[in-house]
């Protein structure tokens, strides 16, 4: 082999390996974007006749949650933003719930407890505020909240970015603010 042939082969090999190396750089996966897409698909999967879109004017813009009321509760006792509630709930990642149902890991578990502390509605994540204000005292429901209404600051329900949530809830009591 001549030195020119050897140089040509070496140059060709370097060019080919450079092209292969550069093309692999474009295949990075954006984990947050993947999680967002997966959670949006999971949320949209609840758009059927079993669930209704629930909204509250002035909360969350045009945002909505999916709500399926299992037990109506006392329709004479509704929930307002200024109320406090005794809200028993089990919280799951929507993607986990779709895969494993009751075997899914719970982010919060109070549904089976006998007593819990009351919480101001205003302190709940926005999506849960919307859902609760569409329920009545004594109601039981399942709720699906999109990632953009899951703005919880609670350390017991902390989630990754772009995580939609699935709730099983029982609204035991509505506590109206006292008037002075």
Residue ranges and their predicted role:
Residues 5, 9-17:
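Sec-dependent signal peptide hydrophobic core
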